């Protein structure tokens, strides 16, 4: 379940979770995969000392966000994030708090599509994007045997159940919690994602992306690979494909410090002494 419920300016209720340092001046939005809800922190030891405020909003049908919140397109989810960012900026300005500048965005799997759509549709709100294992729109494959019905298991994320990286302290529990939260409304979230993924019109806007984009792919993954990254690279002038030699779907975890170095290079304006406590 999300840590909080918020109401967007449109009146739509959305589940909201956060991690990292709330004092940081750097906001990073994390767009989760299919299935995924709540908050997944790839490496809390890195996040907590980096100087970043990590935020995730649940898509309709996942966790605490009801079905029927806004439309069903990738663009609608991007616009939800834009509304959240704009409202957060306005609230900080009116309260005299530090006003966030443009945000960094991380997208995992299908969440990468939402991240790129946000950067295309609202370039003034986003300056850096990192997407991980995001398929090209025409290359996405939805596996009903793994992703349609809960309970969801690791293979739904492309992670073998016996992957040795799952033995990292707390990692399996954090992933299982994300999957359990994704199933709180049954298959409503994955059904909404399937509707969104059936429409590829969002990809026609990719040329409008101005943010500095990294497209990250693990060499030991077969169904989504650097060829998907090349598809995006041809459409996004500011993008670069980054290959990771190993780690599979969990390269997101092993490369988390490098990902944060891209989306939050200045450590949220916090000194090393402050970040290390």
Regions found by a protein language model. Give the residues of each.
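Conserved HGGG/HGGXW glycine-rich cap/lid loop of the alpha/beta-hydrolase fold
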Residues: 12-66
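Gly/Ala-rich beta-loop-alpha elbow adjacent to hydrolase catalytic centers
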Residues: 107-111, 115
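Alpha/beta-hydrolase
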Residues: 149-204, 214
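Conserved alpha/beta-hydrolase "acid-adjacent" motif
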Residues: 222-228
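Short beta-strand/loop motif that positions the catalytic acidic residue
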Residues: 209, 215-217
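Flexible "cap/lid" loop of the alpha/beta hydrolase fold
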Residues: 129-155
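Catalytic active-site module of serine/aspartate enzymes centered on a nucleophile-bearing elbow/loop
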Residues: 238-277
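Conserved acidic catalytic loop of the alpha/beta-hydrolase fold
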Residues: 76-103
């Amino acid at each position: 379940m999300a840590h909080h419920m918020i109401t967007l300016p449109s009146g739509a209720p959305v589940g909201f979770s956060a991690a990292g340092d709330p004092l940081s001046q750097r906001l990073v939005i994390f767009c989760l995969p299919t299935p995924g809800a709540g908050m997944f922190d790839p490496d809390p030891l890195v996040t907590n000392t980096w100087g970043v405020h990590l935020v995730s909003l649940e898509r309709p049908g996942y966790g605490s966000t009801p079905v029927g919140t806004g439309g069903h397109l990738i663009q609608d989810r991007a616009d939800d994030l834009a509304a959240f960012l704009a409202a957060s900026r306005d609230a900080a300005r009116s309260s005299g708090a530090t006003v966030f500048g443009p945000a960094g965005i991380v997208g995992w799997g299908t969440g990468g599509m939402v991240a790129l759509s946000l950067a295309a549709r609202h370039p003034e709100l986003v300056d850096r994007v990192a997407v991980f294992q995001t398929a090209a729109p025409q290359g996405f494959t939805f596996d009903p045997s793994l992703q349609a019905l809960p309970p969801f298991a690791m293979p739904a994320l492309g992670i073998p159940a016996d992957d040795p990286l799952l033995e990292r302290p707390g990692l399996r529990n954090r992933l299982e919690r994300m999957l359990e939260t994704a199933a709180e409304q049954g298959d409503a979230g994955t059904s909404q994602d399937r509707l969104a993924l059936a429409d590829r019109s969002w990809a026609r806007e990719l040329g409008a992306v101005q943010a500095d984009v990294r497209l990250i792919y693990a060499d030991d993954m077969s169904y989504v690979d650097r060829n998907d990254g090349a598809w995006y690279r041809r459409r996004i002038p500011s993008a670069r494909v980054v290959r990771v030699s190993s780690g599979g779907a969990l390269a997101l975890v092993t490369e988390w410090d490098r990902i944060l170095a891209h989306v939050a290079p200045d450590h949220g304006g916090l000194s090393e002494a402050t970040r290390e406590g």
